[in-house]
Amino acid sequence: LHTSSLREFTYLLGREIYETLLPRSRKMATLFIQTIKSISGKFGFDPITNLPTFNVELGDIERPEYTLDEIFQYLSHADKPCIVAIDEFQQIAKYPEKNIEALLRTHIQRSENSHFIFAGSERHMMQEMFASAARPFYHSADMLELKAIPAEMIQFKVSAAKLQETGALEVSVE
């Protein structure tokens, strides 16, 4: 999640929540569509699969603060507790908008049905965000530093079809 504004953050958070819900619970995906009223005109149904679709562009989010509020309202009404993991969380400190840390902290504090995982590659910024008394997220999370995963522990499974699909592999018959 390498975002540069609240609008991008809100868009990606909403998209990821929706795409995670869709295969798991049609009822909750529909509730999400009904809850996010500020961009509701961009939700629809795929006539072929008869599944809801999430077709929103970044420019469609005119008031990201309002849309973010709707997303957190949805999370608070979800039928099961949610785990929200945000990678590269330190990016919010670089947004041009003011007080984003305080805005998110307020939403997260009020969110009784969700648990949050904050991850970031810039350790000093993460440390400052959660350990400085002058910052909104002060003492709001347990800090855990993860070391790099050894290369031999990582396995990749990539099919030839997927490589062809992305253009990374060309097959020619001569």
Regions found by a protein language model. Give the residues of each.
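Conserved beta-strand scaffold positions in the cores of enzyme catalytic domains, especially
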Residues: 1, 143-145
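P-loop NTPase nucleotide-binding core
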Residues: 1-83
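Conserved nucleotide-binding/hydrolysis micro-motifs of P-loop NTPases
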Residues: 2-6, 91, 121-126, 149-152
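Short, glycine/charged-enriched secondary-structure capping and boundary segments
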Residues: 11-14, 98-101, 131-135, 160
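Conserved Walker B catalytic segment
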Residues: 54-122, 131
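Short glycine-/polar-rich loops that comprise or flank the Walker A/P-loop
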Residues: 112-114, 139-142
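Short regulatory helix/loop adjacent to the ATP-binding pocket of P-loop NTPases
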Residues: 123-141, 159
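Conserved small helical "lid"/interfacial subdomain of P-loop NTPases
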Residues: 146-173
